[in-house]
From Swiss-Prot:
Subunit (UniProt): Monomer. Part of the FGAM synthase complex composed of 1 PurL, 1 PurQ and 2 PurS subunits.
Name of the top EC class for this enzyme: ligase
Organismal lineage: Bacteria, Bacillati, Bacillota, Bacilli, Bacillales
Gene this protein is translated from: purL
Name this polypeptide is given: Phosphoribosylformylglycinamidine synthase subunit PurL
GO molecular function: ATP binding; magnesium ion binding; phosphoribosylformylglycinamidine synthase activity
SUPFAM superfamilies: PurM C-terminal domain-like, PurM N-terminal domain-like
Pfam families assigned: AIRS, AIRS_C, FGAR-AT_linker
Amino acid sequence: MSLLLEPNAAMIKEQKLYREMGLTDEEFARIEAILGRLPNYTETGIFSVMWSEHCSYKNSKPVLKKFPTDGPHVLQGPGEGAGIVDIGDGLAVAFKIESHNHPSAIEPYQGAATGVGGIIRDVFSMGARPIALLNSLRFGELTSPRVKYLFEHVVAGIAGYGNCIGIPTVGGEVQFDPAYEGNPLVNAMCVGIIRHEDIQRGVATGVGNTVMYVGAKTGRDGIHGATFASEELSEQSEAKRPAVQVGDPFMEKLLLEACLEAVKSDALVGIQDMGAAGLTSSSAEMASKGGFGIEMNLDLVPQRETGMTPYEMMLSESQERMLLVVEQGREEEIAAIFAKYGLEAKAIGKVTDDKMLRLFFHGEVVAEIPVDALAKDAPVYHKPSAEPDYYREFQAMPTYIPQIEDYNRTLLGLLAQPTIASKEWVYDQYDYMVRTNTVVAPGSDAAVVRIRGTNKALALTTDCNSRYLYLDPEMGGKIAVAEAARNVVCSGAKPLAITDCLNFGNPEKPDIFWQLEKAVDGMSEACRTLGTPVVSGNVSLYNETNGEAVYPTPVVGMVGLVDDLSHVTTQPFKQAGDLIYVIGEAKPEFGGSELQKWLEGRIFGKAPELDLAVEASRQRQLLTAIRAGVVASAHDVAEGGLAVALAECVIGASGLGANVTVSGDLVSELFSETQSRFVVSVKKEHQEAFEQLVEAKLIGEVTNDSILTVNGEHGGTVIRLSVDEMRNVWKGAIPCLLKSKD
């Protein structure tokens, strides 16, 4: 749209055109009061993206304040591109997770690819070198042709971007449920390493300092992407395909290397990714955080399309772009660094002292807005919250106990469920060994990546059981954090901190806002008990299709520190004769379980309980035993219960089996998803030392016959399956579903 065709300020108000941009009548009146006049079209667009939920967190900010964000190792908490945690030796780990849900629902390949690109930029904008990528994905049932299409193209998009830029995708999780049929979730996490002295901030300070634009040229892709991400999906969403950006990983690789060189220069004052809301958010946020203003001449913005208006340039979300603030008079030093990589660093403005965002175009002022009004003073809403009827119904239900006649068939059936089945089809498309630092590849409890130049490693995981959260958001929130910590501990690492991605429905509905509040309450309590502060994160609301919300899905990305590479532990059993222990007892807890969903076709009842004090104690005991060198393998008991955990321990082993005897109620012992449980194998010579350190029950030993045998305590074998049969079912489930013709 040319400037001549843009509606004038009076038309915007009279025709309520601001509503199409996502602003309410009250918000527009507030803008008028802030400016002391009616906003023009460009200013209305700028306010609309900065006041969207995606950029401002206006509906979630009161809830986010509940998270613990401080800790002895935290160097940077929420509010910057990524959180940063000290790991010793003058090094730190920078990490963050973000969503790209709405774009991936419309254009799955580019939506997923640009989600990866954006989170990488968040990490290297802090001055950190990205060393690993993870993801957390949710889709509907794989029997749906539409879901197959989304799944295949999202995975291809993640692989295409990560593989090209040369950062290993080392881990993640994928779950399938009808709740995500129309609204898939695509959350991408990036982890980087940084020296303390290289940490950068996204600030604009120093009057007269130069604002520089680097990276790809600006086009019309992604305009109003932030607003699009703050709406429910509907039949009309397909028309918003232009709001999905297009990524170029090769450009990003050049930008990454140039930025990491530039951060070594003291000429650089501040740096920020042009992510959601592009040039608008990067300039306004940097100025607001620094306590200054920014003035830009939009005629100088590099453009790849002709006739772009100020509105289009400011709202474009073209990828692979960064905004820099550079000391006045030292622009050439920075420009020379970028020129080495074939990139132009273009001066487009300067820092001012009046706390205003002022934009010039063709010699005229086209926008003049207080930066704080766009950033830290954006509206905040305290939404009404109400416990939903379904929750009260579920809480009142009697305990669900499944009836099982054939234990072999039940275990094979669970191994074939896509949420439990092998994700090899997914991670085989990822280059998870590039840079040669990957110690534990995808498929174990957590990925482990070596920290080059040290004897340490990082354990990385993403976790969230959305079904538990639907049944009981507070308990489910606790479990999400606890399970992430469990996975990290099973890998031989001490949990350090988390990043979170809060994926929920429409917060304007009281029952959805209640889910958000309760989930954050549970997560916060778990973070405090387990000593894992929240250092970064993202909120993705309005994940609904035609009024149907996804399950509450607050994904936890956790980083743990392995302080000695010899402590790295994996889930497969290691050798015949080793003793098998289970830590933790089973209760009849099947609400939200894989077994319930498979047998009944739906979930209901109460989620499993979690005692955080017990959880913390068991994790401490297990980590102490691992560090003492008396644990051969460790695996947490999660979806599918103990039977699935044992199957996974033998499937991953080479030529080994297991013979175990379980006591008590067999259905609960084998298939309940009771929390705070682990399967551990121990060499016989370490039996006494292990039993002194850990409260655990000896249930059997590893065999060399490639058969999983499970006996009841009163005699009688209830499960006897060859490892090959289990492996074939487990590995073949997802490829078979993708090949099937509906």
